[in-house]
C-alpha cells in the first residue's frame, strides 16, 4: 500500500489514461492511490508532483470516519474534529498523547476496504474490479471472515498476533499486521523488497491447490494420452485472481518429459512475453465497444468478454490431449505448475517501456506424476 503511488506500472497507466481522457479520470485514480495527494492537490497524473508523497499511509486509513458506498474512493476523511487531530481505529480503549482517538467498527470490516477495492468505469458503469463484491458473495463473508483477517496477519494461517500496537500501548491478544500482504511479487522485487516479495509468494501459495483427476496408467511412443487436472481456490476470499483485469493471470503450465528430461509435450509456456495460445488460464478479459480485447487501456473498455477466474472455495478443471512422439522413450513425467503474474511481460513493456521492469512469475503450486512405459521395448535407464 505504501507503494501505491510510486508504483511505476500504475504511474505509467495513469499517464496514458489521463492523456486519453483529457484528465477526466485523474482524481478517480489518484484518490485510491494517494488520498493525501488528492486532498492536498499535491500530485499530478503526469508526474509533476509538488512534493514527495507516499501512497497509502497511516493518516489515510486512520482518518477515515465513514464510507458513502462501495468503490471509486467512496471514503470520508475526518482528520480533525473541534480543531484537534483525530484518528479512528478498531480499539475502543485506545488513547494517545498526540491526537484524539475514536473507535471505528468500520475499520474491522471488509466494507472499509470496499471503498477502493470495487472499481466502476466512470463513463459507462462497467464493473472493472469487484474484489469486495467477490468477497461479499462468498462463503468467507457468511463465516464472518473479513479482508483484514487474511491481509493483516503476519503470514497465511496465522490468526493471532499478540503484542503492542504502539510502544506505549498495552499488550493485546491480537495486533493487526500493517504489512498488508498482497500478490504483487513483481513490484516488491522491483523495489528490492525481498522480504515482502517472499510474503506475497507465501500468500499466493496458500491460495490454491492442484491435483490430477486422471493420468495414463502407462504410455509408449506414438500413443495418444489424456490428462485431467483440477485447480481449487482454497485460500482466497475472492476470485482467483482478483483485482484489475488488464494483467492479473493465473495459468497452468503442463509439461511431459521423457527419461532424459527432454520435453515431449508442453502447453502453458510463456512465448513472446505472454502465455501461448491454448493455455488454460484463469483471467478476466475486457473488451471495447467493437468487441476487441482491451489489453490495458481500461478507459476504452465497455464490456467483459470472458471471466474464467475461480470463485472462492470453487474449482476449475482442465483436460489435455496429446500424442507421445514416436522416438520418445519412457518412463514419462507429467508436471503441472500453477503460475501467477500481475502483468504479462509484453503488456508491461508497453506500459513502462521495454525491459524496464521484469514481470515475476510466481509458482503457486506444482504437481508431478511418473508414467511407466507400456511395452517391452522400454529400456531401464
Across the structure, where does each feature detected by a protein language model lie?
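Primarily the internal scaffold of c-type cytochrome electron-transfer domains
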Residues: 2-17, 44-300, 306-312, 319-324, ...
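Local sequence-structure signature of Cys/Sec-based thiol-disulfide redox active-site neighborhoods
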Residues: 23
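Conserved, well-structured interaction surfaces
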Residues: 26, 31-43
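Exposed beta-strand face motif in extracellular beta-rich ectodomains
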Residues: 330-334
Amino acid at each position: 500500500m505504501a507503494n501505491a503511488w510510486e508504483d511505476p506500472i500504475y504511474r505509467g497507466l495513469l499517464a496514458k489514461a489521463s492523456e486519453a481522457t483529457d484528465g477526466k479520470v485523474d482524481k478517480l485514480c489518484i484518490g485510491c492511490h494517494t488520498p493525501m495527494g488528492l486532498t492536498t492537490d499535491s500530485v499530478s497524473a503526469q508526474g509533476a508532483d509538488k512534493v514527495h508523497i507516499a501512497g497509502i499511509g497511516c493518516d489515510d486509513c486512520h482518518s477515515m470516519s465513514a464510507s458513502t458506498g462501495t468503490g471509486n474512493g467512496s471514503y470520508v476523511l475526518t482528520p480533525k474534529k473541534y480543531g484537534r487531530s483525530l484518528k479512528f481505529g478498531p480499539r475502543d480503549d485506545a488513547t494517545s498523547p498526540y491526537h484524539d482517538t475514536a473507535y471505528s467498527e468500520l475499520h474491522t470490516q471488509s466494507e472499509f476496504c470496499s471503498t477502493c477495492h470495487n472499481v466502476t468505469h466512470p463513463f459507462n458503469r462497467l464493473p472493472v474490479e469487484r474484489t469486495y463484491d467477490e468477497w461479499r458473495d462468498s462463503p468467507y463473508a457468511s463465516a464472518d471472515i473479513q479482508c483484514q483477517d487474511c491481509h493483516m496477519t503476519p503470514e497465511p494461517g496465522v490468526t493471532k498476533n499478540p503484542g503492542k500496537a504502539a510502544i506505549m500501548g498495552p499488550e493485546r491478544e491480537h495486533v493487526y499486521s500493517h504489512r498488508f500482504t498482497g500478490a504483487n511479487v513483481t513490484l516488491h522485487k522491483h523495489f528490492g523488497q525481498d522480504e515482502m516479495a517472499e510474503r506475497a509468494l507465501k500468500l499466493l501459495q496458500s491460495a490454491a491447490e492442484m491435483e490430477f483427476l486422471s493420468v495414463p496408467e502407462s504410455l509408449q511412443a506414438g500413443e495418444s494420452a489424456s490428462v485431467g487436472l483440477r485447480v481449487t481456490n482454497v485460500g482466497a476470499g475472492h476470485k482467483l485472481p482478483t483485482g484489475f483485469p488488464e494483467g492479473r493471470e493465473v495459468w497452468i503450465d503442463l509439461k511431459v518429459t521423457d527419461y532424459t528430461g527432454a520435453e515431449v509435450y508442453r502447453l502453458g509456456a510463456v512465448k513472446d512475453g505472454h502465455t501461448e495460445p491454448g493455455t488454460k488460464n484463469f483471467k478476466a478479459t475486457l473488451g471495447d465497444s467493437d468487441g476487441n480485447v482491451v489489453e490495458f487501456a481500461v478507459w476504452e473498455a465497455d464490456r467483459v468478454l470472458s471471466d474464467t477466474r475461480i470463485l472462492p472455495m470453487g474449482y476449475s478443471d482442465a483436460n489435455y490431449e496429446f500424442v507421445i512422439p514416436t522416438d520418445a522413450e519412457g518412463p514419462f513425467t507429467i508436471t503441472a505448475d500453477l503460475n501467477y503474474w500481475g502483468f504479462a511481460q509484453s503488456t508491461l513493456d508497453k506500459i513502462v517501456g521495454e525491459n524496464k521492469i521484469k514481470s515475476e512469475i510466481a509458482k503457486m503450486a506444482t504437481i508431478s506424476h511418473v508414467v511407466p512405459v507400456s511395452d517391452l521395448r522400454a529400456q531401464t535407464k
